[in-house]
Amino acid sequence: MPLLDSFKVDHTKMKAPGVRLAKVMQTPKGDNISVFDLRFCRPNHEIMSEKGTHTLEHLFAGFMREHLNSKDVEIIDISPMGCRTGFYMSLIGRPSETEVIKAFENSMKDVLKVTSQDDIPELNKFQCGSYKMHSLSEAKEIAQNVLNKGICIIKNDEIKLENF
């Protein structure tokens, strides 16, 4: 089985919170598709709570689109990592890491402004596969942690595993 790109980086050297341009590919028509690693926690040191991650999944995707989508950038998907240390974001276009950091920070500020569990989008049994597995307070705690620590740029050449 081929080794996925996400496993070709040394997770022991990865800083967090951080933004890493994980991959850029081009479609046959010439559009750039960029994949970003949006790291919330240091791998193997911290982990986001299950309910907080799920609530962030519902909130973060919309907030990031509000702050990052433009005539040159369109987010395709934002999904949590199985290790619960971050999210992957796939998009059409090639925003800078600085632009992504600004959108990430503003999205975390937006999470802190959500006042009620009732304000979480798609939080119902028809649109969510685990609609009872949410915690706005845990999502806010994660967001505040990101803002308190600050978001850095994670450079691939600094965390590349040798021999891969």
UniProtKB/Swiss-Prot annotation:
Cofactor stoichiometry and binding? Binds 1 Fe cation per subunit.
Kindly give the Gene3D superfamilies that the UniProt entry links to this protein.
S-ribosylhomocysteinase (LuxS)
Pfam assignment, any one: LuxS
Q: Which cofactors must be present for this protein to function?
A: Fe cation
Lyase is among the record's keywords: yes
- Reply yes or no: does the keyword Phosphoprotein apply: no
Known partners and oligomeric status: Homodimer.
In Swiss-Prot or TrEMBL terms, this protein is called: S-ribosylhomocysteine lyase
According to its UniProt entry, this protein's organism is: Campylobacter hominis (strain ATCC BAA-381 / DSM 21671 / CCUG 45161 / LMG 19568 / NCTC 13146 / CH001A)
